[in-house]
Amino acid sequence: MKVLVINTGSSSFKYQLIDMPMEQVLVSGLVERIGEEVGQMVHKIYPNTSQEKKYTTTQPFSTHVEGMQAVVAELINPKHGILHSVKEIYAIGHRVVMGGETMKHPALINQHVKNIIRECAIFSPLHNLSHLAGIETAEELFPGIPNVAVFDSEFHQTMPKVAYLYPLPYDIYDDYKIRRYGFHGTSHRYVAQQTANFLNRPIKELNFITCHLGNGCSMTAIKNGKSIDTSMGLTPLDGLMMGTRCGDIDPAIVPFLIEKTEKSAKDVDELMNKQSGLKGICGMNDMRDIHEACAQGNAKAQLALDMFIYRIKKYLGAYYAILGHLDGIIFTAGIGENDTIVREKVCSGLENLGIFLDSSRNNTHSSTLRLISTDNSPIPIFVVPTNEELEIAKLTIQLVSNTQ
């Protein structure tokens, strides 16, 4: 069964065609610069295999529909297309960032679900409205094929009130549903389940702290296989220091900046989302560049790295305290999977908590799930490559199969 997985942004979208249950990626691609004078599509057949072939197209895509039409043309291309017809696609899975309190599970997309995605756009306007554009494009170009929404926030709907409520007047929650929602849920769920499989134990028996560290960063406390707390909040701005996002700050900073700098609320929001974090401290948001600058004695780069590590350690300690018992720490995403220095610094000094990193294992690069703690470490440490597209494909197949 072939599942098309789509992740739509405001001016781009990524896609994969996955053959299930073999979990073989037949096609992956990216259409970007939608709405600009010149757009680009990169379309790969059998990616990351010896059979990989890449096709690049440069042309204007005025809308998401035009971009997806170009993808369809490649999928059924008489010379190198994977499909004879788009009717071979069993289902389409869409990543949707925000599902609010209503969407606790993946959902077959109908008008009601689209209305909820639109309503939740008040908390994530750029993401949710883009996802809607992707969904409506798929409905237009793939008629009769079921579409499924998989929400970033749904995994965290198991958090208790003590974790998700903000200590504001309760009426604000009642009236506006302002609370912690959390994000990266598809990734946190996937790597936790993969680790449970590796340990050959049921996920419902296991407690993990998952660290999704990329340009966007979040951590989750998982108790008996369920999220009980997570670092991102009402929006993805909360929590850890990130590439360009500030993470936790004193809320009083916002009105202070508006008053003193005469910036608008929108300007301050942009500053916190796009000009802060690692970039705000040292001018760089790529961790590889920061490591290089640190090696050259750049004090601000070193400060940015130290602040980044410090915040992760704070959350790790806090989540250990609320979990009580820990079956593993999991690193994932771009930095978590590939950055040996960050992992070493995060784990350094935590031996009294039962966390012992094995330097040799940590410095061994691999694209597979692996243990990087010592054999006698009371708490094992894992590196687990995330695969949100595969998780979306699995959940899509499961839902569509159960409803037919």
From Swiss-Prot:
Gene3D superfamilies: 3.30.420.40
Xref: PROSITE patterns: ACETATE_KINASE_1, ACETATE_KINASE_2
Site residues (Transition state stabilizer), renumbered to this chain: 184, 245
Active site (catalytic residues): 152 (proton donor/acceptor)
Binding, ATP: 14, 212-216, 286-288, 334-338
Pathway info: Metabolic intermediate biosynthesis; acetyl-CoA biosynthesis; acetyl-CoA from acetate: step 1/2
GO molecular function terms noted in the UniProt entry: acetate kinase activity; ATP binding; magnesium ion binding
Disulphide bond pairs: none
Protein name: Acetate kinase
Matches recorded under SUPFAM superfamilies: Actin-like ATPase domain
Cofactor list: Mg(2+); Mn(2+)
